[in-house]
Amino acid sequence: MTKNKTMNIKLLSAALGIALSATVMSASAQKAYTAGTVTATTSMRGMDIQMKEYFTLDSMATAFAAGPANIRLLTDANFKSFVVLVDVSAFNVKKAAVYTPDEIDQVLSAYPTFTYAPTTETKQISGFNCKKVVATDSKTKKTYDIWVTNDVTLPASATSKYYAGAGGVPIQYTAFQKGQDGNLVESQFTITSITEDKAPKGTFAIPSDFDKISKDDLEAMSRGGQ
């Protein structure tokens, strides 16, 4: 395996963790749209990443690029299924990692549980009227400033371990991924737009030319083992 391929796979690993965090969060928000697209920005390893989150009443798909890899995360409305699609055309890699229900529960259980304290601070972010809510991690007592809006509502397409009780749709917030040492790594997310644009055809399905693998197989890829 070349050095560049190893670096790209490691970047993919970081991207998957952050994207899963974002999917869990955004799917939890109470939305007034029945279907549409959420665009969000974040950064990882010094690279700016734009994510497209397509949603319906019963499905969510998050799509983004990490180096040469195109990633798509698929989940159902209740977050009872989770699939990671990895397409790296340069290396002829097309994989679909299917998580088991127990594996999904393990991932979700690692995330913080928050209590919330609304503030009187307000500002506009991406055209949304937002108010600041201070979220406190019940375990570590660390606090996070979460900016939420009541300008829009979105369908509850998953049960969130994040900001379901924040009092609005999070627009600027902290997301979490599990690092290689087992500790949570934080990333900042900003939603830049919410539209009624429908997902492209086939967005929520596993393509027929993708090889199905396990979560363990995916983690081996992320460590550069494949």
Tell where the protein language model's regions lie, with residue ranges:
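Extended soluble regions of mature proteins
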Residues: 30-226
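Bacterial Sec-dependent N-terminal signal peptides
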Residues: 1-33
